[in-house]
Amino acid sequence: MGAKDLAEKNLLQYKDVFSDIVNVNLFGGKCYVSAEELSREPGELITKTVSDDKLRQLQMDVPMKCKKNNRSFFLCLENQSDKNNVMPVRDMGYQHAKYMEQIKEAKESNRKTSNYPNPMTKELNDSQKLSPVITLVLNYSQK
């Protein structure tokens, strides 16, 4: 990882910078997400591939959780220095892993409390909602 990439990640970890970027790019500059509503999330996600059942490590650049009006959603800023045609697929992988992490936590909670959904094929109870996962790619290339 280059010094430039580290500097970009370091800057984006400041919650006020992060919220400004999100507000400008998602909400047209309206102050919807404040720095106070953000908390840092681990960037490392461990997931299991379906094809060969092996564990894989994914590394998101700067993920944060936003708690607003008793609801939560996840935001991730990804830096891109050069054009990369597979970036959307990588982002889908990050989002998939984050959703699967939430499902795993909800199912574990159900197991601990013996509060299983009915029928079991539903996997989650009707009251268990997944928090949205939103990724923004910041492309710094000139192309």
Across the structure, where does each feature detected by a protein language model lie?
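Accessory alpha/beta interaction modules
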Residues: 1-143
